[in-house]
């Protein structure tokens, strides 16, 4: 192998001034000869090739000298290659000036001279002209690949000098972007060229303008036309552009004139002989539709449709293009090819006629100019004629001679500019075509065939190489296509330059080709020879791009068989006179757009044809809003005041987003329902019904915003109710959705609809509904995917009620609907988050999807408003003449008025050419010039060559920001494909917004332009001018905002065989800031879709999904999806090619009609029709429709359990707020976080003084983080000693949470406690969670805090409900609140001390270790309470059902040792003790022993099974209630039946009844009691510790006393249930109707609110977490069971024994788990009824003293019974499903004053909390509940640890539809929620210890392993399980309204970051059990 001459040589190329092509040749020469090259100088280089010495820096020279590198100029390479040897570099010294290298000082402004004088010295003036640039830009001598942007020719006055100035835009990315060149022709016929480069288009234009102005100052003048000498100065690219100049200015020879007349006559004559209508009266839109029909027939022909079906489809083609003799021949490919050629010919003729104002036979010169093609005759005596003739004839392979008659040189402008000559391999080839087609070919060039195999069907090799442009190199082949003309008998051949580029030879046919194979530019079908067999008879060359073709000649020839005729056209070669311009330019005021609201001068009400008012009786509207869509039902009632039957027409106005989907009428007791039928069928049925005397109703949609209802034969004096249902989309303004109902009709729509006569039988009275003012009502439901921020109306006063995501609004009484309509504004949170809705059809297997996408672009993209350009392009072509051009000016002027002074603007008029206001966009400070430029425009600029404007602007692309083109046109563009190519090519910097004007506008091409150009299309319909301003404003707003374009949707389809998704819109338009996209689709079993879009040329992708949970059932989205498909059919883009678009429309027509019928939607093809059969003997208006009843049937109130939010006076309570039948609360924020109550109980209204006092009472507030407590408790409580003051103090508004600290300070106005004290008080008061206290749910029960225990059974919730509790209402000063020392501690022997704190003669509660211990007598009441009233219907309380598990509970004597049990010893510090023994009735209970610091008291066990409510005294606990009558038959309640499992429950007498028990002994310090045995399954009862959750005492000996149970607390033996009214049922009472729900008593309130004390431990549990099914707890009150699942729960608060060992460095974590409340299961039977709940109902864990202290002294049992009765009534109303009972109302007013008693014990509480702060987290209990797989179950045990109301959460999830996930899906989701809650709980605790982590799933493993290594693997396993499972439920958190994501949801559930007015806030804060 021979080595190259440059082997082992590495050349460093430093050729700065060498042209690009020479640089490439240099590189190629080096590589082909074995060398290598580099652009960097390195030690490996052997040679440096430089073209000028100035390119080498000092550093380069040092390196060259150091490494001994040889230097040479480029000639060294060229000569070495030529001589095939490596030459000596010394002969190519680069230091000597190279001939091609310019001087160094001219690197900025280059001057090149050709034929300069001998001294080579340029003239001084020319040098000065060029020294303008200041940019450091390398400028090549000549741009090789460029386009000419601007050019001018100037001649010097008085001298022969000429200069051509060009602004060139480089197409080479490596070259200078813009170059300004000036080519001078000097006086001595020598030339000189100057060039300057610029980097930006703005700089280039400014320099160009400045350069031309400088030439003018030097004496040069601008010239309009190029002379022959000046043309030689132009660049090759400019000479191609000058073809346009030659066409416009050149004279027309006789030969060219004759040719034009021949091809014109041939084309026009063919059309006249074929078509029935003249071509100038045809619409291009009809041509496009006809082409679509042909494509549809072609497809049907391929599919084998029957001939009858084909003929039926072709009939539509003949309707669009009427023929003189419709073809009756068989439909085949040949016929279709002929008709396609006919359509193209019609299109060509219409376009040509546009230039000549549609004149049928313009003069020859006008025809010539209309073709826009240069045609020159080539004389036969020239060398060019001989050369072309020879090339044509030499390839004639047939034996038939051909006679060349004439040759014409042709050239088209866009072919010259777009021709891809750089592909190479340019050959002269032939294309034959019939003479009638030559007119179109010259006008628009050769086009790709629409159907390749339709070309020349007579040939055997039709479409052999697919869909391309076919050429041949043989005349004999082209003759087959070049048919002789009928005018003169000659044939025409098109000779073209074809850039074949890299051509592939094929020997087999390939019909599927639509482009050249990869790597090739063209295809050559090789003809068959004897040696090479192929499929081709002739050589065929095929290209697939029109810009590979450039026409050069038209050859006129004939064959021996042709008969040449003499043709003498009419001599008319002169151009017609130009139209006279208008004498005066119209003023801008003449083009003002009408106002947006044109209804101000229209009368309101109904009117007949004589304008007599016919008042509308009433208008009622019911609506349903879901997300951004709505369904509205309108009831219109009116009466025929005439004495004769009439046909009335009713005009129903709507916006263009609406679609009617239902029409009904009620008249004379009849209900007529409209049916959708095809329009003609409906009208025929209507006419027949009217003629037969029947009633008939017809509803049409003539325009998008007007529906007409024709009511035929309306009887005299008849009242008619018309019910119209429609669907619509809401408009969007930022995050606000706007729903609007118009109150008037567009006047320009009324006349046409009213004047149309449908029947001739009865009188027609035309009615215009202009807005009914007499009677109007509206009610709407609103459902949003995210939180509703606000709801308001600027037209009407509303009342409303709402939850987070749902609301109901209605107008107030007395509202009216005037011409302003009705407007509703809905503020949304997170409106920018995409979402997906799926709806199942209730009656068939169908699913409709809706995607909502509203990108928040303003926050993502920078504001480029000041950098953007706006170019207003006004179409001034001839087709715009008339009213269309007036409308275009109106649009342009209004758009101009909306542009600010800081906006860069330019205005361009275009037709065949273009004119611009400025040479480049400028800021307009004065719009006068711009306005005059628009006003002076006239539709006389010829064709619509918008591509020239696009090309010009694309060459001058903006350096920064966007260019926004606003195109105002009728859309009849020339060169559509080229125009679209230019738009797509420049999308990165240019956006195209299109405005269609005129009734015949080509909306498809304009819509496609905007779609491809990242803009938006608007059609300005002359029938809806009232919306024009809004449309223009919308376009200008989009122009100023960032955009998101090329949006596409990909639907997830599980089956590969699934049909193509039916989506609307098929082509998604571009989106802008605040734009909202709704995409509909009929896609079965689809739960996921992907949205893709481009923002600033970066692709973004987002996925939206839903689950079975989110799928709804109904027809609303189905109707919306059908409506969207119909709209897309009418106005959308089904395909970018117009022919295919029309074909798809024809295919979809039947589908559209079917969708219309199925969904009752009016379309352009269908109408509503209803016929009312009438009998001549029927009595007129015998049954007047009951309007109110019909309206009431449409109930949209889906929040019946929420009351209306209404304003009320400050100091009084109105009657409307007191409703005894339904007592509910909904709160309105006052702006400061305080929730104000709206309504109160009617029972409370019986004591107005209490309510007024409550109203005036200041609301106490609680701050979560800090709380200032006043110390003037003495002053505040001293006043309460009197009954009057006690009454006023104890009844005030409910306690609410206010976050402002100053409000607390102002109300309490006391000295601040120390921070530590405040913190302790906060924890005591808030139970470590600050909760809102809604008034409707605050319990009036005695309070127990999570950190406060009583040393008695009263420490349990049930004990608090005891009727024996005796705590007075008045409270003394706090014992530790003042300056005096605390009282002495109680003695161990039980010595009594005075206790004013508890208001009795018994000793005060002992205080030890921060624990208040009230005396048992004060807690249990001793003998102070009278017996309860007897039970109605019997003397015995029915026994409760058995407890599951089979355990028998012995009597209290056996349980607690009877009266012989000695008192327990005193406990030392840290010891947990059980409650004292409970004795039988009659025993006096002494004060309990003292507890050491830190002692925790357990609560009693939760017991279920009783079916009786407590007595009133147990509900309100006071000792001042009158005694109820005794129970008949004795004082003892009969024993209950055995509890399931055999357990006997002790009687309350044994629990609470004793009075003489001596104080129990104190246990020594450190004493521990062994744990009790489990309950379930045992034959013995559990010890007290197991029931009360305290310390572990040994089980006591059995005894015999029994006791009864109640679902709401213990019922003492001497007390029966309260007497209730006959309408309420006692639980378990068989004498009352079973249908009524169980009664919830006051215990329900306590159990929700208070929970257990700090010492509570949950000893019982479910058998396993798997056995726990929250859904089972809503079955009834008697199905709760307990089992000893986790014994560690019994010692939950013995943290030293529970917590695992930890490293010494890690201190124990502080947690609120130690303050756990009552087990959830204890109250599940009560709380399970809470199906519905008020949005803000959540009760704070507050400290409450006894009920008695909250009630006035004169509060009677009647009041308590009233509350019970109300509660029962409420439960009856709501089916026992609501917590918003009247007892809640009562509790709201009772509980608030309990803060007084809270304040009196702050010091002790603070001391207690200080102790509690050191309590560690019960880690062992928490991780004991974790499953093997790592997750937790959502059980009450877990809820107890997390301080979470599990049942409330489960109830809410059930309401949200969690069961739709299925059993497994539901359980798995509950496990996920539980696990995430635990992880959030751990995350928060670890974060307090200093851990830093991103999220609850991404914790710091290192930190966890250091601090709690024993739990590291458990936490890791949980995180991995949660991460995997979370992905299976995308967006489920939002669907269930839990929050934005799991992070925020879990924080809210745990109270870490509570948020008011959220779903979770209301779910969990109403009941913390």
From Swiss-Prot:
The residues covered by the PARP catalytic domain are 362-566
Which Gene3D superfamilies does the record associate with it? 3.90.228.10, BRCT domain (3.40.50.10190), von Willebrand factor, type A domain (3.40.50.410)
Instruction: Tell me the ranges covered by the VIT domain, including all copies.
Output: 600-728
| Domain VWFA, residue spans | 869-1039
Domain FH1 as annotated: residue spans: 1443-1541
Q: What happens when the gene is disrupted?
A: No visible phenotype. Mice are viable and fertile for up to five generations, with no apparent changes in telomerase activity or telomere length.
Q: Name one GO biological process term.
A: inflammatory response
Query: Which EC number applies?
Result: 2.4.2.-
Question: Where is the motif Nuclear localization signal annotated in this sequence?
Answer: 19-25, 1230-1242
**Where found?**
Cytoplasm; Nucleus
Q: Which residues carry this modification: Phosphoserine?
A: 1229
| Catalysed reactions, semicolon-separated | L-aspartyl-[protein] + NAD(+) = 4-O-(ADP-D-ribosyl)-L-aspartyl-[protein] + nicotinamide; L-glutamyl-[protein] + NAD(+) = 5-O-(ADP-D-ribosyl)-L-glutamyl-[protein] + nicotinamide
Question: What InterPro entries does its record include?
Answer: BRCT_dom, BRCT_dom_sf, PARP4, Poly(ADP-ribose)pol_cat_dom, Poly(ADP-ribose)pol_reg_dom, Poly(ADP-ribose)pol_reg_dom_sf, VIT, VWF_A
Q: Which residues does the UniProt record annotate as the domain PARP alpha-helical?
A: 235-363
Q: Where is this region: Disordered?
A: 92-132, 1372-1608
> What GO terms fall under cellular component here?
cytosol; nucleoplasm; nucleus; ribonucleoprotein complex; spindle; spindle microtubule
Question: What are the record keywords, sorted?
Answer: Cytoplasm, Glycosyltransferase, Methylation, NAD, Nucleotidyltransferase, Nucleus, Phosphoprotein, Ribonucleoprotein, Transferase
Which Pfam families does the UniProt entry name for this protein? BRCT, Drf_FH1, PARP, VIT, VWA_3
| GO molecular function terms noted in the UniProt entry | enzyme binding; NAD+ poly-ADP-ribosyltransferase activity; NAD+-protein mono-ADP-ribosyltransferase activity; NAD+-protein-aspartate ADP-ribosyltransferase activity; NAD+-protein-glutamate ADP-ribosyltransferase activity; nucleotidyltransferase activity
Ranges for domain BRCT: 1-94
Spell out the residue ranges making up region: Interaction with the major vault protein. Answer: 1808-1969
Q: Which family does it belong to?
A: Belongs to the ARTD/PARP family.
The entry describes its oligomerization and partners as:
Component of the vault ribonucleoprotein particle, at least composed of MVP, PARP4 and one or more vault RNAs (vRNAs). Interacts with TEP1.
Q: What does this protein do?
A: Mono-ADP-ribosyltransferase that mediates mono-ADP-ribosylation of target proteins.
Q: What is this protein called?
A: Protein mono-ADP-ribosyltransferase PARP4
């Amino acid at each position: 192998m021979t080595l190259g001459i440059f082997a082992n040589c590495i050349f460093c190329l430093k050729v700065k001034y060498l042209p690009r092509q020479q640089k490439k040749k240099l590189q190629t020469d080096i590589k082909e000869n074995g060398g290598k090259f580099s652009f960097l100088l390195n030690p490996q280089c052997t040679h440096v090739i430089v073209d000028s010495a100035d390119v080498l820096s000092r550093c380069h020279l040092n390196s060259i000298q150091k490494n001994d590198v040889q230097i040479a100029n480029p000639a060294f390479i060229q000569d070495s290659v030529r001589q095939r040897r490596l030459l000596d570099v010394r002969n190519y010294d680069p230091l000597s000036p190279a001939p091609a290298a310019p001087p160094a000082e001219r690197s900025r402004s280059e001057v090149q001279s050709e034929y300069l004088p001998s001294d080579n010295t340029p003239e001084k003036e020319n040098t000065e002209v060029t020294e303008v640039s200041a940019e450091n830009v390398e400028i090549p001598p000549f741009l090789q690949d460029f386009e000419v942007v601007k050019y001018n020719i100037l001649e010097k006055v008085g001298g022969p000098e000429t200069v051509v100035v060009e602004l060139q835009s480089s197409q080479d990315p490596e070259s200078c972007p813009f170059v300004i060149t000036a080519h001078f022709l000097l006086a001595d016929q020598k030339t000189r060229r100057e060039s300057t480069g610029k980097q930006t288009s703005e700089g280039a234009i400014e320099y160009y303008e400045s350069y031309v102005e400088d030439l003018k100052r030097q004496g040069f003048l601008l010239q309009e036309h190029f002379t022959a000498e000046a043309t030689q100065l132009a660049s090759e690219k400019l000479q191609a552009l000058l073809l346009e100049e030659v066409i416009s200015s050149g004279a027309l020879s006789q030969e060219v004139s004759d040719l034009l007349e021949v091809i014109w006559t041939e084309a026009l004559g063919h059309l006249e002989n074929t078509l029935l209508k003249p071509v100038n009266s045809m619409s291009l839109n009809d041509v496009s539709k006809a082409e679509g029909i042909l494509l549809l027939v072609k497809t049907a022909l391929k599919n084998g449709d029957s001939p009858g079906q084909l003929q039926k489809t072709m009939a539509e083609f003949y309707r669009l293009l009427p023929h003189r003799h419709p073809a009756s021949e068989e439909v085949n490919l040949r016929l279709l090819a002929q008709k396609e050629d006919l359509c193209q010919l019609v299109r060509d003729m219409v376009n040509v006629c546009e230039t000549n104002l549609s004149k049928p036979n313009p003069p020859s010169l006008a025809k010539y100019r209309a073709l826009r093609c240069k045609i020159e005759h080539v004389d036969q005596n020239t060398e060019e004629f001989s050369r072309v003739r020879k090339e044509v004839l030499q390839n004639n392979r047939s034996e038939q001679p051909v006679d060349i008659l004439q040759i014409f040189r042709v050239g088209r402008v866009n072919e010259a500019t777009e021709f891809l000559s750089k592909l190479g391999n340019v050959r002269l080839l032939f294309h034959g075509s019939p003479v009638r087609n030559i007119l179109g070919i010259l006008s628009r060039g050769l086009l790709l065939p629409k159907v390749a195999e339709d070309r020349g069907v007579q040939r055997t090799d039709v479409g052999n190489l697919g869909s391309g442009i076919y050429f041949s190199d043989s005349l004999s082949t082209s003759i087959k296509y070049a048919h002789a003309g009928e005018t003169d008998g000659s044939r025409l051949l098109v000779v073209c330059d074809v850039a074949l580029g890299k051509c592939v030879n094929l020997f087999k046919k390939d019909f599927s080709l639509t482009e050249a194979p990869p790597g090739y530019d063209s295809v050559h079908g090789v003809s068959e020879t004897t040696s090479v067999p192929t499929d081709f008879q002739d050589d065929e060359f095929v290209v697939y791009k029109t810009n590979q073709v450039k026409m050069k000649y038209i050859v006129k020839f004939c064959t021996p068989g042709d008969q040449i005729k003499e043709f003498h056209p009419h001599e008319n070669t002169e151009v017609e006179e130009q139209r006279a311009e208008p004498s005066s330019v119209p003023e801008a005021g003449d083009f003002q757009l009408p106002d947006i609201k044109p209804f101000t001068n229209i009368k309101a009400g109904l009117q007949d044809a004589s304008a007599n008012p016919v008042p509308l009786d009433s208008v009622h509207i019911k609506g349903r809003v879901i997300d951004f869509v709505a369904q509205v039902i309108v009831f219109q009632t009116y009466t025929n005041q005439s004495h004769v039957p009439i046909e009335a027409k009713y005009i129903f106005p709507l916006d263009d987003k609406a679609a009617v989907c239902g029409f009904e009428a009620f008249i004379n007791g009849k209900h007529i329902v409209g049916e959708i039928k095809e329009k003609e069928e409906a009208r025929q049925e209507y006419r027949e019904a009217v003629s037969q005397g029947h009633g008939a109703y017809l509803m049409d949609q003539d325009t998008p915003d007007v529906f007409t209802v024709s009511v035929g034969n309306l009887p005299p004096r008849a009242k008619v109710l018309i019910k119209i249902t429609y669907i619509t989309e809401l408009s969007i303004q930022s995050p606000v959705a706007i729903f609007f109902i118009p109150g008037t009709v567009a006047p320009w729509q009324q006349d046409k609809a009213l004047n149309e006569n449908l029947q001739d039988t009865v009188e027609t009275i035309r009615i215009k509904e202009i807005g009914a003012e007499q009677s109007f009502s509206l009610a709407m439901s609103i459902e949003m995917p995210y939180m509703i921020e606000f709801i308001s109306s600027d037209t009407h006063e509303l009342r409303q009620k709402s939850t987070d995501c749902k609301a109901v609004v209605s107008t107030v009484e007395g509202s009216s609907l005037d011409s302003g309509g009705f407007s509703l504004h809905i503020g949304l949170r997170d409106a920018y988050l995409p979402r997906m809705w799926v709806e199942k059809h209730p009656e068939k297997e169908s699913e409709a999807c809706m995607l909502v996408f509203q990108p928040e672009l303003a926050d993502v993209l920078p504001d480029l408003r000041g950098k953007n350009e706006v170019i207003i392009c006004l179409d001034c072509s001839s087709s715009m003449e008339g009213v269309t051009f007036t409308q275009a000016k109106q649009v342009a002027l209004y758009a101009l008025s909306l542009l600010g002074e800081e906006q860069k603007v330019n205005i361009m008029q275009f037709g065949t050419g273009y004119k611009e206001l400025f040479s480049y966009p400028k800021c307009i400070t004065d719009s006068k010039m711009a306005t005059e430029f628009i006003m002076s425009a006239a539709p006389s600029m010829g064709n619509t060559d918008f591509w020239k404007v696009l090309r010009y602007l694309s060459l001058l692309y903006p350096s920064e920001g966007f260019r926004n083109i606003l195109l105002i046109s009728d859309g009849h563009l020339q060169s559509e494909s080229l125009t679209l190519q230019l738009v797509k090519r420049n999308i990165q910097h240019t956006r195209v917004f299109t405005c269609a004007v005129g009734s015949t506008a080509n909306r498809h091409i304009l819509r496609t332009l905007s779609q491809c150009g990242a803009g938006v299309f608007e059609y300005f319909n002359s029938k809806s001018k009232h919306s024009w301003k809004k449309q223009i404003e919308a376009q200008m707003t989009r122009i100023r905002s960032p955009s998101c374009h090329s949006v596409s949707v990909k639907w997830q389809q599980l089956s590969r065989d699934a049909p193509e998704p039916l989506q609307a819109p098929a082509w998604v338009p571009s989106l802008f800031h605040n734009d909202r996209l709704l995409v509909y689709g009929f896609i079965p079993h689809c739960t996921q879709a992907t949205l893709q879009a481009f923002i600033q040329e970066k692709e973004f992708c987002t996925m939206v999904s839903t689950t079975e949970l989110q799928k709804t059932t109904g027809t609303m989205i189905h109707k919306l999806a059908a409506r969207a498909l119909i709209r897309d059919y009418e106005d959308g883009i089904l395909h970018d090619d117009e022919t295919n678009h029309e074909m798809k429309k024809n295919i979809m027509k039947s589908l559209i009609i079917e969708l219309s019928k199925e969904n009752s939607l009016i379309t352009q093809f269908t109408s509503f029709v209803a016929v009312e059969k009438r009998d001549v003997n029927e009595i007129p208006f015998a049954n007047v429709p009951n309007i109110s009843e019909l309206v009431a049937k449409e109930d949209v109130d889906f929040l019946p359990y929420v009351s209306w939010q209404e304003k009320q006076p400050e100091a009084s309570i109105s009657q409307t707020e007191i409703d005894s039948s339904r007592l509910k609360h909904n709160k309105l924020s006052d702006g400061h976080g305080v929730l104000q109550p709206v309504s109160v109980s009617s029972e409370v209204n019986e004591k107005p003084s209490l309510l007024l006092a409550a109203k005036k009472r200041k609301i106490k507030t609680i701050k979560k983080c800090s709380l200032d407590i006043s110390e003037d408790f003495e002053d505040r409580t001293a006043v309460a000693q009197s009954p009057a003051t006690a009454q006023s103090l104890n009844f005030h508004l409910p306690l609410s949470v206010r976050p402002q600290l100053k409000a607390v300070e102002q109300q309490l106005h006391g000295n601040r406690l120390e921070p530590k004290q405040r913190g302790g008080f906060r924890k005591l008061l808030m139970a470590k969670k600050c909760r809102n206290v809604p008034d409707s749910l605050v319990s009036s029960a005695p309070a127990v805090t999570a950190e406060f225990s009583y040393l008695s059974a009263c420490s349990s919730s049930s004990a608090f409900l005891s009727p024996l509790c005796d705590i007075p209402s008045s409270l003394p000063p706090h014992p530790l609140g003042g300056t005096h020392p605390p009282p002495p501690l109680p003695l161990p022997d039980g010595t009594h001390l005075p206790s004013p704190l508890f208001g009795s003669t018994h000793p005060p509660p002992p205080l030890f270790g921060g624990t208040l211990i009230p005396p048992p007598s004060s807690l249990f009441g001793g003998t102070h309470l009278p017996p309860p009233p007897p039970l109605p219907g019997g003397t015995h309380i029915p026994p409760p059902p058995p407890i599951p598990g089979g355990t028998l509970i012995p009597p209290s004597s056996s349980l607690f040792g009877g009266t012989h049990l000695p008192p327990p010893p005193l406990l030392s510090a840290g010891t947990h003790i059980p409650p004292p023994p409970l004795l039988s009735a009659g025993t006096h209970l002494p004060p309990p022993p003292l507890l050491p610091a830190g002692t925790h008291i357990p609560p009693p066990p939760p017991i279920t099974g009783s079916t009786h409510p407590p007595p009133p005294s147990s509900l309100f606990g006071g000792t001042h209630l009158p005694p109820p009558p005794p129970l008949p038959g004795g004082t003892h309640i009969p024993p209950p039946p055995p509890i399931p499992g055999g357990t006997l429950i002790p009687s309350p007498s044994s629990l609470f009844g004793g009075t003489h028990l001596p104080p129990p002994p104190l246990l020594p310090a450190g004493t521990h009691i062994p744990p009790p045995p489990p309950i379930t399954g045992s034959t013995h009862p559990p010890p007290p510790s197991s029931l009360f959750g305290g310390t572990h005492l040994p089980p006591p000996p059995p005894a015999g006393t029994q006791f009864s149970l109640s679902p709401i607390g213990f019922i003492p033996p001497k007390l029966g249930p309260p007497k209730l009214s006959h309408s309420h049922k006692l639980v378990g009472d068989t004498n009352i109707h079973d249908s009524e729900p169980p009664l919830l008593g006051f215990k329900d309130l306590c159990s929700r609110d208070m929970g257990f004390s700090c010492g509570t431990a949950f000893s019982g549990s479910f058998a396993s977490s798997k056995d726990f099914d929250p859904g089972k707890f809503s079955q009834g009150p008697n199905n709760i069971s307990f089992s000893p699942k986790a014994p560690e729960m019994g010692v939950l608060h013995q943290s030293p024994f529970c917590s695992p060992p930890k490293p010494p460095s890690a201190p124990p974590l502080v947690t609120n788990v130690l303050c756990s409340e009552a087990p959830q299961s204890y109250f599940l039977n009560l709380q399970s009824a809470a199906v519905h709940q008020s949005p803000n109902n959540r009760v704070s864990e507050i400290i409450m003293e006894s009920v008695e202290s909250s009630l006035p002294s004169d509060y009677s049992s009647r009041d308590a019974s009233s509350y019970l009765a109300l509660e029962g009534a409420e439960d009856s109303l709501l089916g026992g499903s609501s917590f918003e009972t009247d007892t809640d109302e009562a509790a709201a007013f009772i509980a608030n004053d309990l803060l007084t008693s809270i304040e009196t014990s702050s010091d002790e509480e603070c001391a207690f909390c200080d102790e509690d702060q050191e309590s560690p987290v019960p880690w062992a209990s928490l991780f004991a509940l974790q499953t093997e797989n790592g997750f937790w179950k959502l059980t009450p045990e877990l809820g107890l640890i997390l301080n979470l109301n599990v049942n409330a959460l489960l109830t809410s999830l059930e309401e949200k539809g969690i069961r739709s996930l299925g059993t497994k899906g539901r359980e798995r989701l509950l496990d996920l929620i539980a696990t995430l809650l635990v992880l959030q709980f751990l995350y928060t605790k670890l974060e307090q210890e200093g851990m830093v982590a991103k999220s609850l799933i991404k914790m710091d493993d290192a930190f966890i392993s250091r601090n709690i290594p024993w739990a590291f693997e458990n936490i890791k396993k949980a995180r991995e399980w949660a991460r995997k499972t979370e992905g299976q439920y995308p967006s489920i958190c939002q669907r269930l309204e839990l929050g934005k994501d799991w992070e925020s949801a879990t924080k809210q559930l745990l109270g870490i970051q509570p948020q008011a007015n959220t779903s979770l806030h209301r779910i969990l804060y109403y009941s913390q059990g």
